[in-house]
């Protein structure tokens, strides 16, 4: 089941049980919070604003890194890996899912799928 991001006040986005505080660049969850580096924040904000929508790597690179994007998709994979680790540490019920040759999306994960 996928839910679009819900805006909470002017500085919060919410998907599943995770909130993104856009003022402090922090992921907030019932278990705690994780501060995000600049690129991590930009990528997570893009995912949360487009929850459930597959986005090709090229779009992620253009929107987060802009015209100065490094060649190759490895940099996107690395930052997605950082975000996945932080989401896991928080016990989030959302995951960044990969679809071969189609891109990545942020999805709400049912409890049975998390185990």
Predicted region positions:
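A structural micro-motif at secondary-structure boundaries
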Residues: 14-41, 105-115
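Glycine-centered flexibility sites
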Residues: 16, 52, 66, 101-103
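Short aromatic/basic micro-patch
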Residues: 12-14, 19, 35, 54, ...
């Amino acid at each position: 089941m996928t839910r679009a991001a819900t805006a909470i006040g002017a500085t919060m986005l919410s998907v599943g049980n995770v909130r993104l505080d856009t003022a402090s660049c922090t992921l907030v969850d019932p278990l705690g919070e994780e501060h995000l580096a600049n690129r991590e924040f930009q990528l997570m904000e893009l995912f949360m604003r487009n929850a459930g929508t597959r986005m090709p790597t090229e779009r992620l690179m253009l929107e987060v890194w802009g015209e100065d994007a490094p060649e190759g998709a490895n940099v996107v994979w690395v930052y997605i890996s950082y975000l996945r680790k932080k989401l896991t540490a928080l016990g989030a019920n959302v995951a960044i899912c990969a679809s071969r040759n189609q891109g990545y999306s942020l999805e709400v994960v049912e409890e049975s799928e998390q185990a």
